[in-house]
């Protein structure tokens, strides 16, 4: 489609008439990204990247800085909202076959990896007890890499243990990565408008399109308003709902928490990591839990794009969603029976979705051919 940028500028971009609410999460992610950068800047102004002062500076922000408590809560809960939107966005892409826009899907998966890295670095910054130990456990996984692992870990830590240089590096990375995310988001949107958005039927949208503005802008604004309402209600009434009680204590390298775990949005990957009783195997499974998304465009074998008309794949998709929830829940529990077994079974089922997807596509093609 020629001159897409000019059409976007005047809000005249032709879009399929039948795209549903599931297509609104892209604009919601853009809003989340803007809010995170803005609140993050105001927090960075008052934050001190020093192991003796970091925890105190967070206390200072929430107690002494005007509306500092709001900035801190908006930033922390905004991150959770960001991940709710991105996981829904990915699920929609898997369900409706949006991954067949290869360049858009691959740039989006790269965005997810960058976002997860940024969120991880941000979780360490308050220098609470869980922040410190989560950083210790996750960064220590680098030592599982043959030959280079120990050197890479020492380089990342800035020494032989997590200390002041580690916090300084993590703050620098947490500050710089969002600019990379913004740049890549622009590329993601540009690539999307090169091919055009898919639709719930998985058909060619060219025959039935309407201008993006005002029709879809109003639809986007409705979902955006609901998201902001949910965010502000959580900030006002349940500000600590996603926080770990351990993180209200300053980091102490001499006391290990009973159960080390990251933020809720990493629990599915952490659950997959824990389910394998081998360091290198667990680290590989952790990486593969995200990287396997990159295989989706290349393993699609079905003649039908969307799962709207694929009942067997619908069953498998909702099994994947349930599996994701089960792994997240199991990862909050101690490493003991029956939780280890549940994690192992759920992790296997998670990967089985991506393995059986091309087989089911081939099977569906055979059924349609014989009918």
UniProtKB/Swiss-Prot annotation:
User: Which GO terms fall under molecular function for this chain's record?
Assistant: metal ion binding; ubiquinol-cytochrome-c reductase activity
Q: Where are the transmembrane segments?
A: 25-45, 69-90, 105-125, 170-190, 218-238, 280-300, 312-332, 339-358
What InterPro entries does the annotation carry? Cyt_b/b6_C, Cyt_b/b6_C_sf, Cyt_b/b6_N, Cytb/b6-like_sf, Cytochrome_b, Cytochrome_b_C_euk/bac, Cytochrome_b_N_euk/bac, Di-haem_cyt_TM
* Biological process terms in GO annotation: mitochondrial electron transport, ubiquinol to cytochrome c
Alphabetical keyword list: Electron transport, Heme, Iron, Membrane, Metal-binding, Mitochondrion, Mitochondrion inner membrane, Respiratory chain, Transmembrane, Transmembrane helix, Transport, Ubiquinone
Query: Which GO cellular component terms, listed alphabetically, does the Swiss-Prot or TrEMBL entry include?
Result: mitochondrial inner membrane; respiratory chain complex III
Where does this chain mainly localize?
A: mitochondrion
Q: Where does a ubiquinone bind?
A: 193
Report membrane topology.
Multi-pass membrane protein
Q: Where is heme b b566 bound in this sequence?
A: 89, 188
Top-level taxon: Eukaryota
Q: How is the cofactor bound?
A: Binds 2 heme b groups non-covalently.
**Pfam families given in the database record:** Cytochrom_B_C, Cytochrome_B
Q: Where in the cell is it found?
A: Mitochondrion inner membrane
List cofactor names only. heme b
Which residues participate in heme b b562 binding?
75, 174
Question: Which family would the database say this protein is a member of?
Answer: Belongs to the cytochrome b family.
Look up the further comments and give them: Heme 1 (or BL or b562) is low-potential and absorbs at about 562 nm, and heme 2 (or BH or b566) is high-potential and absorbs at about 566 nm.
The function of this protein is: Component of the ubiquinol-cytochrome c reductase complex (complex III or cytochrome b-c1 complex) that is part of the mitochondrial respiratory chain. The b-c1 complex mediates electron transfer from ubiquinol to cytochrome c. Contributes to the generation of a proton gradient across the mitochondrial membrane that is then used for ATP synthesis.
* Protein name as catalogued: Cytochrome b
Protein's organism:
Eryx colubrinus colubrinus
């Amino acid at each position: 489609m020629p001159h897409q940028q000019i059409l976007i500028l005047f809000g005249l971009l032709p879009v399929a008439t039948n795209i549903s609410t599931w297509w609104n999460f892209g604009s919601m992610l853009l809003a989340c990204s803007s809010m995170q950068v803005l609140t993050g800047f105001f927090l960075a102004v008052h934050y001190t990247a020093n192991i003796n002062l970091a925890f105190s500076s967070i206390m200072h922000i929430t107690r002494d800085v005007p509306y500092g408590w709001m900035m801190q809560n908006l930033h922390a809960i905004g991150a959770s909202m960001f991940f709710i939107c991105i996981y829904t966005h990915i699920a929609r892409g898997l369900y409706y076959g949006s991954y067949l826009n290869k360049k858009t899907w691959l740039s989006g998966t790269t965005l997810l990896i960058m976002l997860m890295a940024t969120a991880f670095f941000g979780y360490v910054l308050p220098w609470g007890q869980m922040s410190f130990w989560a950083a210790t456990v996750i960064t220590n996984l680098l030592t599982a890499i043959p030959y280079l692992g120990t050197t890479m870990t020492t380089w990342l830590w800035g020494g032989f243990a997590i200390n002041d240089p580690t916090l300084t590096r993590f703050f620098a990375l947490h500050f710089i990565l969002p600019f990379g995310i913004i740049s890549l988001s622009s590329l993601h949107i540009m690539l999307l408008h090169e091919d055009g958005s898919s639709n719930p039927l998985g058909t060619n949208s060219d025959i039935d399109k309407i201008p993006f503005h005002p029709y879809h802008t109003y639809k986007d604004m409705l979902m955006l308003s609901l998201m902001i309402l949910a965010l502000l209600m959580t900030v006002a009434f349940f500000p600590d709902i996603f926080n770990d009680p351990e993180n209200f204590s300053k980091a102490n390298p001499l006391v290990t928490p009973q159960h080390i775990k990251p933020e809720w949005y990493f629990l599915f990957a952490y659950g997959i990591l824990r389910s394998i009783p081998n360091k290198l195997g667990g680290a590989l499974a952790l990486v593969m839990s995200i990287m396997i998304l990159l295989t989706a465009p290349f393993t699609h074998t079905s003649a039908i794009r969307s799962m709207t008309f694929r009942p067997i794949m619908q069953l498998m998709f909702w099994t994947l969603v349930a599996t994701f929830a089960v792994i997240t829940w199991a990862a909050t529990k101690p490493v003991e029976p029956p939780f280890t077994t549940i994690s192992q079974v759920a992790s296997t089922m998670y990967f089985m979705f991506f393995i059986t997807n091309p087989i089911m596509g081939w099977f569906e093609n055979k059924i349609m051919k014989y009918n």
